């Protein structure tokens, strides 16, 4: 007969390869697959590998013009998920050649771009990625990283303190600057634009940048400490975003900010390169992440979004609190906190880490804990996150009964007390309340803060459990 072997073949005949030995250069992915009834797991896993690499639904003539063996994704392992009847973890290996160098955008378009709407699957979740060293090396990564940031700020041996300025929408630039000044003057290291403060009618971006810079220079002069305010450069176009970043640099401020998921990885990587070239730190907010990562069976985990951010570039990223008002299961959160900060992270399924990841000295990212936290959480936060973190109290600073500056004082006193106690060998988990109470005896600001928030709890079970 003429022609080639046309027709529809099972994916597993080509894309399920249980004997495949993964290469050091492969990008490896772990997917949580929930097939439709009647679809065998091998076929579902192979379908994921095919549709996210070289495959399509039928054999095509042009397959003969290339080497599938060289370019195809391969499903090389399938394991059942404990306690879930029809759910599997499918491991897929992708050859490095499938990806454009230095493009997080292309990596995600390839791996998660198309396959999540696939009919043979009820649901699909990307649990983890192993980024090979060869691919990591094509990325600049964070603009500066943890060590350089500490050197720039001259702050060592403790977590950094921040505060999001509230009410997040509606303040004029002048009043916004007043709020920034009071917080920094009271003892915080940073204040922050909210993620949705961009350039609205009540406060245009340029006025805000000028007011905040004035506030931080005044606070810096009075305290002798280096201060920062995260100026949110996120905008409707990349050109506008860069214009804002350039103006921030002209003001001489130390740090700008970007919403990396709503702004997109392409814009984020552009900004990160500019920040490294011009000595600006880059704070990253993860607005929209829960749309993608909160469902247990579908979407992708935050650890994947966090890896993508470390490659694209950012010096800080919000990462949940474990104790406040927003999602964050302790082991899972600590798993991706290590993926952000450390150079080498061992596979550890108990923390949701499916692969050993070597970052080959790509700079680390400081995790930012924020959302419903206050002074009474300080011992737990210091214990959980350690020194390399930013603890951000929005309402937990500005909600102080005496105002912003006393709120900032209370937080700084609580933090210094916890760090000192830890350095003296005390157990923060057990003696935390006692440590805060002792400090409150000589700090009226802290005593007042403890009084206001002594009863507040955000007690709900976490959604994302292993």
From Swiss-Prot:
The record marks 325 as: Transition state stabilizer. Its EC number is 4.1.1.39. It is found in: Plastid, Chloroplast. The keyword Disulfide bond applies. Binds 1 Mg(2+) ion per subunit. One of its GO terms (cellular component) is chloroplast. Gene3D superfamilies: Ribulose bisphosphate carboxylase, large subunit, C-terminal domain (3.20.20.110), RuBisCO large subunit, N-terminal domain (3.30.70.150). This is Ribulose bisphosphate carboxylase large chain. The lineage of its organism: Eukaryota, Viridiplantae, Streptophyta, Embryophyta, Tracheophyta. The gene is rbcL.
